[in-house]
Amino acid sequence: KNGYLLIILHFDNTLYINLSMTKIYKFQDDISTEALKDLEKCSSLAIDTEGSGLQIPHRDKLSLIQFSTGNNDAYIIQPNRKNYKAPNIVKILENAKVTKIGHYLRYDVSGLEYFLKCNVKNIFDTKVASKLCRTYSQNHGLKDLVLEFCGKKLDKRLGSSDWNKKLDELTDAQLQYCSNDVIYLHKIRDALHKMLVRENRLELYENSIHFLKTRIKLDQSGFTEDIFQH
């Protein structure tokens, strides 16, 4: 009906879905031990989150967590919003051997660390990289990077969906939206890294990422403004 090939297989608490050729694995509360072992074998992992708002403490919630290994797959996890206990997710986020690739990680890392009580290690932010090397453009959104480096047009209209619905209530289109936020990030990271090297701005980027952790701590402490501004 919608041009989708949809196959659902049950593996314990995991659902495998082939949606528009994207392999989607759905998990409730946490990823399985088997999935953790698979993800730990990766040198890099794309990450993203969906929330019920701007993550104002005691009001908004971390609704979904998405991962991708870069092989046109997506792991979509709905954390337990009562206690946010997800030890396997925490293990992969704190694994310094695995680079976590994301777009505007100032938002995602802040939410993950606040709700999961973890320390996300080894990150690559495609938005920061884009601003440092794509100076020929004023457009640094994910959809802009996907179009330029992957030749795909993303539909971002579902970004304001109710992500707090039950996992099995999310539509095929919503699942694909969540997947699109991670499945292209590896290719984008590779392209931007080459540009940073070419423009001799890799060290500047690395220093910016080093400061990003402090920027996130400032956000979490209520200092959302630019403290360096006059």
Question: Over which residues does each language-model region extend?
Answer:
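Polybasic, lysine-rich low-complexity intrinsically disordered segments
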Residues: 1-2
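Short hydrophobic targeting helices and cationic amphipathic motifs
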Residues: 5, 9-11, 19
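Conserved RNase H-like, two-metal-ion catalytic cores of nucleic-acid enzymes
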Residues: 20-144
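A broadly conserved amphipathic alpha-helix scaffold signal in soluble, globular proteins
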Residues: 110-113, 143-147, 183-190
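A polyampholytic, Gly/Pro-enriched intrinsically disordered region
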Residues: 140-154
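Acidic, Mg2+-coordinating catalytic module of metal-dependent nucleases/exonucleases
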Residues: 154-215
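Long, charged alpha-helical interface segments
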Residues: 210-230
